[in-house]
Amino acid sequence: MPTRMITKDEVTLWSEGIGDPADAPLLLIAGGNLSARSWPDEFVERLAAAGHFVIRYDHRDTGRSSRYDFALHPYGFDELATDALAVLDAWQVRAAHVVGMSLGNTIGQLLALDAPERLLTLTVMLGGALDVDFDADLEAALKGEPSVSGLPVPSRRFLDMMMLLQQPAGTDEELLERRVEKWRLLNGEGVPFDSDEFRRRELLAAGHAGTFDEPIVHHMIPQPPVSRGAELARITTPVLAIQAMCDPAAPPPHARHLADRIPGARVVEIENMGHALPLAVHEPLAAAICAHTRAATV
């Protein structure tokens, strides 16, 4: 598959295009601390087979993109959003269907607000609306208190995952097993966890990045001001909010809360899906995304 290295303000971003460039472009924006490889090849190929030219890329500080000392070179969500636009520019894409998960869910909302002319549609999942203070909700969950937002806080599985990432691991094999365990916790209890499937993916991701060490820098990025949530009402891009019904990070009804703030936004629920992309959810997830993109182009 063709790849492109993109230089933007001294930051280099790795990107890849999958499918027929003549098809409708679809940009995948990954979650925090995750590279383009977090979008499984099998899932990407489904989207391409459905008539999309799929573009995925490594966030800065992941995969083959630039890595810096965050203390010396801090950045925020605005920079991550402009990275996504730089990727579209590099592939000479005027406007694209955009799909964002987790951290990409937040970036997608910012793009719909600040660069609506670059979006044909937006699909978001595995995250909350801009008016939800996730950091405060996470703190409440750690204390066993209700959320500030009134929405469900991250579950025990998500808290266990956060604790796992703080544990030391020495050898590559130990790092690999920790990565697999992270996904077991995020996968939730709805879909049986296939450790071999995720071990294979993590080997590919580590090979892509050249290291088994996982970045953690995106946990240091302050979330956008919750005041931006009031702006969601002016979004005109067709929006689909996908609710993973077993998501330990953003449990129901986070997607409904988001959709209720955007005119015309729709919600699709994926039963048994957690905060991960196992093979078992690829078919319904791709079907929901492709139905949304097709509806906007009819």
UniProtKB/Swiss-Prot annotation:
Its EC number is 3.1.1.-. Keywords: Antibiotic biosynthesis, Hydrolase. Residues 25-277 form the AB hydrolase-1 domain. Belongs to the methyl esterase DnrP family. Pathway: Antibiotic biosynthesis; daunorubicin biosynthesis; Antibiotic biosynthesis; carminomycin biosynthesis. PANTHER family: AB HYDROLASE-1 DOMAIN-CONTAINING PROTEIN, HYDROLASE, ALPHA/BETA FOLD FAMILY PROTEIN. Involved in the biosynthesis of the anthracyclines carminomycin and daunorubicin (daunomycin) which are aromatic polyketide antibiotics that exhibit high cytotoxicity and are widely applied in the chemotherapy of a variety of cancers. Catalyzes the removal of methyl group from the carbomethoxy group of rhodomycin D (10-carbomethoxy-13-deoxycarminomycin) and 4-O-methylrhodomycin D to yield 10-carboxy-13-deoxycarminomycin and 10-carboxy-13-deoxydaunorubicin, respectively. GO terms for biological process: antibiotic biosynthetic process; daunorubicin biosynthetic process; doxorubicin metabolic process; glycerolipid catabolic process. One of its GO terms (molecular function) is intramolecular lyase activity. This is Rhodomycin D methylesterase DauP. It comes from the Bacteria. The lineage of its organism: Bacteria, Bacillati, Actinomycetota, Actinomycetes, Kitasatosporales. It catalyses: rhodomycin D + H2O = 10-carboxy-13-deoxycarminomycin + methanol + H(+); 4-O-methylrhodomycin D + H2O = 10-carboxy-13-deoxydaunorubicin + methanol + H(+). InterPro entries: AB_hydrolase, AB_hydrolase_1, AB_hydrolase_fold. It holds the Pfam family Abhydrolase_1. It is an enzyme of class 3 (hydrolase). Gene3D superfamilies: alpha/beta hydrolase.
